[in-house]
């Protein structure tokens, strides 16, 4: 009845848009990375590089956002503080500072970076010619790909015309 009264008087009914943001969807996402090179500088730091970086995880570099990472392919206790770095050859290409991982972490291991459900994909870029990653939804133990990984052809299509 109220809507009819508003329309009869030719008032516009306002529309409300909602942007869910980190508080709602942030915890719903996990980003998986494969470990590449590991560089241990005794007495300074241990760097664990992964197959992604600031092109798909920019919030640490932009805002100093903090994340937690877990080794997911083996059940071992975390006993060492490391820096998880991306592969983009930038000093700011850091995924997680002071990550707690097992000292046995090695090339080929998989790390899960938690709480990446908000903004990670929407802020992803092709910086350094990096392909945007795929996105999967999980429900009842089953994975469904909802966004395919960007192909090399898609990446360079505008550069080849």
Can you say where each PLM-predicted feature lies in the sequence?
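Short, small-residue-biased leader/transition segments that mark boundaries at the very start
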Residues: 1-6
């Amino acid at each position: 009845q109220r809507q009819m009264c508003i329309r009869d008087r030719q008032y516009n009914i306002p529309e409300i848009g909602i942007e869910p943001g980190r508080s709602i969807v942030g915890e719903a996402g996990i980003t998986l990375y494969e470990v590449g090179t590991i560089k241990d500088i005794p007495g300074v730091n241990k760097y664990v590089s992964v197959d992604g970086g600031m092109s798909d995880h920019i919030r640490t570099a932009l805002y100093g956002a903090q994340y937690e990472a877990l080794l997911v392919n083996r059940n071992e206790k975390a006993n060492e503080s490391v820096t998880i770095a991306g592969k983009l050859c930038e000093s700011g290409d850091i995924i997680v500072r002071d990550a707690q991982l097992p000292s046995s972490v090695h090339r080929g291991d998989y790390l899960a970076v938690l709480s990446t459900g908000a903004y990670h994909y929407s802020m992803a870029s092709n910086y350094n010619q990096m392909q945007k990653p795929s996105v999967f939804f999980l429900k009842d133990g089953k994975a469904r790909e909802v966004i395919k990984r960007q192909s090399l052809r898609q990446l360079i299509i505008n550069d080849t015309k």
